[in-house]
Each structure stands twice: as C-alpha cells, then as structure tokens.
Amino acid sequence: IWHKEIQDIIVLKNNKGTEDNRVRKLDYSIQLSKLFYERFITNEKITLFSPHDVPGLYDSFGTEFFDELYVRYENNESIPKTRIDAQELILDLLKERAETGRMYLMNIDHCNSHSSFLDKVNMSNLCQEITLPTKPIQHIDDPDGEIALCILSAINVGKINRLDELEDLCDLSVRGLEELIDYQGYPVKAAENSTKKRRSLGIGFIGLAHYLAKNGEHYDDASAWQLTHDLTEAFQYYLLKSSNQLAKEKGKCEYFERTKYSQGILPVSYTHLTLPTTSK
C-alpha cells in the first residue's frame, strides 16, 4: 500500500484506459497493516516511497519494526516521497475492488502476529488463506530457498452430529496428508525443502451453513457465533492432538524450533500472551 506506484497498480483491472496501462487478466493482492488503517480512521496522510529509496522498509513490513522505520523515512526530507490522503487512497482501492473483483487484501502484520511461525511470513497465495514462510531462490535448483506449498484437505462438518465425531476425522486427515508429504514428487528443490522440513498442513471444513441449520441456527444470526466458535475450537484441538501424536510416533519436524508451538504458544493463546517477535 505504501509503494509509490500504488495508484497505478490498483487500477490495472479497470475497464477504462488502454492496453498499455491495464493488465485486466492479472489477479493480485494489496498488503496493508494497522498503521494505514489508523491513518484512514483519523483522516491523515499516507506517504508513498520507492522501496529502493528506503532500505529495510520492505523487509520490515509486517513486523513490529515497520512503523518506527516508516515514520523515520517520512521525516527524512532527503528521500523522494509522495503524500496522499489515506481515505482517498484506501477508498479508491475499495472502489476498484468492488467494481472489478478479484483484488485481494492481506493484513500482513496480523498474519505475522497470529501465525504459528517465528519466521516471517512475507506473502500469501491469491486468496490469502495460506500464510507460510518463504525464502528467495537464486535459481530454479537452489537448495537453500523455500517455496511454500500447502497440503490441503477439508472435512464436511454438515455430516457430523456431535463434536467428538471430529476426532477420528481430523486424525484421518492429518495422517493422510502427512503421508502425502513424503509420497509426492517435487520438481523444485526449494518446494521440497520447505514442505518436508516444516510439514505444514492446511485442513479446513466445508458445510458450515448445513451444520448451523442442523442445529437450529441461521448463518447470519449472532446466535450462531458461539456454535461456530465451539466447532472451530474442537476442530483445531483435534487437529493439534493428532499432530502431537504423530510427533510422538515419528519425532518432531526439522523446523519445529522455528514455530511458536515450540514455545508453548497455541492459536488459542494469541489473545492472552505477548507473542515473540518475528525475525526481520
């Protein structure tokens, strides 16, 4: 959001303009952080920079180091910059998103503060539901880089009648995907690196509206919130229980010490603990 060309970027899918300044078939996302929401609310300015003129700003985006560095560069009169009303920029972004669709938003600081990793999350996939650490590769066979892959499955919660039915389903999903990590082929070494050392699994659920209806709740009613909370809490508990059992059987993953789990921090702890800082 703070890139000097952001105003040109957010209109790339707009039907106005010419083929020279539009890329209408490109799908992309825009990263924001708390600082920019605060400036939107208070109707302040956002300062736009070229990443080449502000060393370290790109790497710190999404960490607790960003705000201080950003303000320092704002106050440095020797650095080229453009100031724009925060409300003007963000409302333009939302307008383009509403009119063209498929422009996604990522709250990069929140992704890091609530992730299960001590390593920094830099990016996501298009729909923003996969937030895994990555590391640049210097060439296609670079063994030191990390390309994040997410091994996915979903459980149809509309088919269950009791929360304890999730235990076997979650265990089956975890064990099945765990085997898939070692079974499948990897054409790129950096993808194999990340997947086998982190062993990240993405297990979600479908059929939520069905589940709520079976329990006498409407999808858009506030009374459904507690039911959904209880479902997701049980869902995650059983997934973590299965993962923990696998670690007892096979040993912990190679990068376990690079997770917040290694420090005893679970997702349910996020609102109660001061989290460790992410690495720069």
Predicted segments with their positions:
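Active-site cavity-forming subdomains of large catalytic enzyme subunits
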Residues: I1-D142, A148-I151, N161-R162, A190, ...
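Active-site-adjacent bridging/hinge elements
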Residues: I10, I147-I151, R175-P187, L212, ...
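Inter-helical turn/loop segments and adjacent helix faces that build the functional surface
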Residues: E19-D20, K81, K159-D164, P187-A191, ...
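Glycine-rich, acidic/polar active-site loops that bind/position phosphate-bearing ligands
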Residues: I84, I147, S153-R175
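Core structural elements
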Residues: L180, S194-N215
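Glycine-rich and small/hydrophobic secondary-structure elements
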Residues: S223-S242
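Amphipathic alpha-helical
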Residues: Q236-K260
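Conserved small/polar residues in nucleotide/adenosyl-binding loops
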Residues: T271-T277
